[in-house]
């Protein structure tokens, strides 16, 4: 099997001065990425636990990833947007020996050794390091939403990452040495779809930060300054960008390939994209974090648009088998499947199976196959995706119920065109609500210390009681009807 460090070494030799990663005016060449990651690997080589990698869009986040792979310890990426309480929960679970903090923020409550970028830059360690990562080692652990309020650490094997990167490079028809755009923060596994396929094809990884996402004008300046060839993002991000009337082939004729993952690509969005970029390749992909980013793909063409609405997610990638249970739940089998959740045997046993050397994962997604193509038909549990972020409604409810103002709570997703657009909290308050705005503000303020912003309901509906089913369970369907009514 291919080894991405060996491939990276090839490009270090072939094009040492080519830019490997760029964020605005901050960039690292392939030679610098290799040397800085080797110095970090020397610092990490005795660590028996994964390294926590903390920061936003610094090129040194990529140094952290490559250094952790070379050392063999692997990494756990955490973006600076993650609330401190959640960061502390992850650190408590991982119990790292070393944290590489690429940001200016201070991390509290940790006994780990904290390294800063200057520690690597000033280090006198050798600039060469032979990679220690084995194919069956855990290369990264990404934490996703957990139903009890405790995030789950999804452990991905190095062989799974190598297989994924090789597959993505085979889908990329633009060739080597291209400019790749990465929209996703590194704590979101969609970023993996850009990072490793880019670097193992000798490309330049261009990092989109949160300011660019908030202000499309800044993104536009970036695209003008550096013409992109390959675009990797959630469908929601491209929907926002398509509000810019000049995002088309005439203005950006270098853009030849788009990859979308993380949520449903709507027919409407895909149609606009095909119209604006008729000569580009647009790929719709699907996959949970637990199966190494994505396991299916399909190129969206005029023919596909005319034939299917909603759109299919395509066919399984090599080495992966998909099948649906009698209940319609999609099950993924093969090398792409995670090794399970970090230090959480109960949650692992509930959805993973490792019998006879074959790994399977029960996704919780409803799926069907038609004309040899897979279609995703929503969730069979309470897990949803909003703006590309996967979350469990029960986690938000758990945090809501911790408020002194809340007696009972259910979170209801609001759908538009088959996609979740925002959340509403149905709340039974502990006292009568005199001032709706003040109460909403107070509860949102409390949630901000415990949940990422994207998991906080947009508004709240106050109810005297929550309806129950005949079995005595919460009647979520009825609650949704009342809230949406």
From Swiss-Prot:
PANTHER family: ENZYME, PUTATIVE (JCVI)-RELATED (PTHR45398:SF1), PTHR45398. It catalyses: holo-[D-alanyl-carrier protein] + D-alanine + ATP = D-alanyl-[D-alanyl-carrier protein] + AMP + diphosphate. Its main location: cytoplasm. It comes from Staphylococcus epidermidis (strain ATCC 35984 / DSM 28319 / BCRC 17069 / CCUG 31568 / BM 3577 / RP62A). D-alanine binds at residues 189, 293, 473. The keyword Cytoplasm applies. Signal peptide: none annotated. Its EC number is 6.2.1.54. InterPro entries: AA_adenyl_dom (IPR010071), AMP-bd_C (IPR025110), AMP-bd_C_sf (IPR045851), AMP-dep_synth/lig_dom (IPR000873), ANL_N_sf (IPR042099), DltA (IPR010072), DltA-like (IPR044507). Keywords: ATP-binding, Cytoplasm, Ligase, Nucleotide-binding. This is D-alanine--D-alanyl carrier protein ligase. One of its GO terms (biological process) is lipoteichoic acid biosynthetic process. One of its GO terms (cellular component) is cytoplasm. One of its GO terms (molecular function) is ATP binding. NCBIfam families: AA-adenyl-dom, D-ala-DACP-lig, PRK04813.1. Belongs to the ATP-dependent AMP-binding enzyme family. DltA subfamily. Pathway: Cell wall biogenesis; lipoteichoic acid biosynthesis. ATP binds at residues 144-145, 284-289, 365, 473. It is found in: Cytoplasm. Pfam families: AMP-binding, AMP-binding_C. The keyword Translocase does not apply. Catalyzes the first step in the D-alanylation of lipoteichoic acid (LTA), the activation of D-alanine and its transfer onto the D-alanyl carrier protein (Dcp) DltC. In an ATP-dependent two-step reaction, forms a high energy D-alanyl-AMP intermediate, followed by transfer of the D-alanyl residue as a thiol ester to the phosphopantheinyl prosthetic group of the Dcp. D-alanylation of LTA plays an important role in modulating the properties of the cell wall in Gram-positive bacteria, influencing the net charge of the cell wall.
């Amino acid at each position: 099997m291919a080894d991405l460090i060996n491939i990276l070494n090839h490009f270090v030799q072939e094009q040492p001065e080519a830019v490997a990663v760029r964020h605005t005016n901050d960039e690292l060449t392939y030679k610098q990425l290799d040397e800085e990651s080797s110095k970090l690997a020397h610092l990490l080589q005795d660590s028996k636990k994964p390294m926590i990698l903390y920061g936003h869009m610094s090129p040194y986040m990529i140094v952290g990833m490559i250094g952790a792979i070379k050392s063999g310890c692997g990494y756990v990426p955490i973006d600076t947007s993650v609330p401190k309480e959640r960061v502390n929960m992850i650190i408590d679970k991982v119990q790292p020996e070393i944290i590489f903090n690429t940001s200016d923020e201070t991390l509290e409550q940790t006994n780990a050794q904290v390294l800063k970028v200057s520690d690597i830059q000033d280090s006198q360690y050798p600039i060469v390091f032979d990679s220690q990562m084995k194919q069956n080692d855990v290369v990264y652990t990404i934490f996703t939403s957990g139903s009890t309020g405790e995030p789950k650490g999804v452990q991905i094997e190095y062989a799974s990452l190598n297989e994924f990167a090789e597959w993505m490079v085979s889908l990329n028809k633009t060739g080597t040495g291209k400019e790749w755009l990465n929209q996703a923060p590194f704590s979101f596994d969609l970023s993996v779809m850009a990072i490793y396929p880019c670097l193992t094809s000798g490309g330049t990884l261009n990092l989109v930060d949160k300011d660019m996402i908030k202000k499309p004008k800044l993104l536009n300046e970036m695209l003008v300054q550096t013409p992109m060839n390959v675009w990797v993002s959630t469908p929601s991000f491209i929907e926002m960008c398509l509000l810019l009337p000049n995002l088309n082939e005439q203005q950006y004729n270098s853009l030849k390939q788009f990859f979308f993952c993380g949520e449903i690509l709507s027919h409407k969005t895909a149609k606009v994209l095909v119209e604006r970029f008729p000569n580009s390749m647009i790929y719709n992909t699907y996959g949970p974090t637990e199966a190494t980013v994505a396991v299916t793909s399909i190129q969206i063409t005029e023919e596909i648009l005319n034939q299917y609405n909603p759109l299919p997610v395509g066919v399984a990638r090599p080495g992966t088998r998909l099948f649906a249970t009698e209940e319609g739940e999609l099950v993924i089998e093969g090398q792409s499947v995670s090794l399970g959740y970090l230090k959480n045997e109960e949650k692992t046993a509930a959805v993973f199976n490792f019998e006879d050397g074959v790994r399977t994962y029960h996704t919780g997604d409803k799926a069907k196959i038609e004309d040899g193509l897979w279609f995703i038909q929503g969730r069979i549990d309470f897990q949803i995706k909003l703006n590309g972020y996967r979350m469990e409604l029960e986690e938000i409810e758990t945090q809501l119920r911790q408020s002194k103002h809340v007696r009972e709570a259910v979170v209801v997703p609001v759908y538009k065109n088959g996609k979740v657009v925002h959340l509403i909290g149905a709340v039974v308050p502990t006292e009568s609500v005199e001032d709706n705005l003040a109460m909403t503000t107070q509860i949102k303020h409390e949630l901000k210390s415990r949940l990422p912003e994207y998991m906080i309901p947009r508004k709240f509906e106050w109810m005297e009681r929550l309806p129950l089913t005949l079995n005595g369970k919460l009647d979520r369907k009825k609650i949704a009807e009342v809230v949406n009514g």
